[in-house]
């Protein structure tokens, strides 16, 4: 939308912005009713920083997993790469700064924490968050023309802990044949 101030009054601009805000609020409200449960394997072979995060937070691995899975998160923003959603807020006990040395490659599906947020890496990218687990499958569907992200602003997300065997079974089931 382009507004030319010489052709429109302040009152008209205010009315237009009010309408736009009302529409965006309705859209956000309808999205906020959507929720998704994401299975995550918190096995140390997939949660590359699980042990170090446990040590840094003075929580056992089980307490760390419980803290991460025990709440509903809200998608606060998206960005960095398509399908990358910033979820908040994490349990105060697992708030940590980003890693001192970012990784050049974070595997797709990695679930990570930093500061007061958690994320799922939609594809392999560099990253500086603490990796505590990995979801099987993909958080995005790559089509020829577009990327369909499963997470959008306002959605509610909950993580569910799964075993390494369940992770492998889901990966095998979803593998292209």
What are these regions (language model features)?
Residues 2-177:
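Glycine-rich active-site loops that engage anionic ligands at enzyme catalytic sites
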């Amino acid at each position: 939308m382009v507004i030319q101030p010489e052709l429109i009054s302040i009152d008209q601009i205010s009315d237009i912005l009010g309408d736009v805000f009302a529409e965006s609020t309705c859209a956000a409200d309808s999205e906020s009713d959507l929720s998704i449960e994401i299975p995550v394997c918190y096995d140390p072979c997939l949660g590359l920083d699980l042990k170090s995060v446990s040590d840094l937070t003075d929580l056992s691995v089980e307490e760390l997993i419980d803290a991460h899975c025990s709440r509903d998160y809200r998608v606060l923003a998206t960005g960095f790469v398509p399908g990358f959603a910033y979820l908040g807020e994490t349990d105060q006990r697992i708030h940590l700064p980003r890693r001192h040395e970012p990784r050049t490659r974070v595997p797709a599906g990695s679930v990570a924490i930093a500061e007061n947020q958690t994320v799922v890496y939609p594809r392999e990218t560099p990253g500086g968050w603490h990796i505590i687990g990995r979801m099987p499958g993909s958080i995005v569907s790559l089509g020829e023309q577009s990327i369909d992200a499963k997470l959008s602003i306002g959605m509610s997300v909950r993580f569910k802990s799964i075993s390494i065997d369940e992770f492998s079974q889901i990966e095998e089931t979803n593998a292209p044949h």
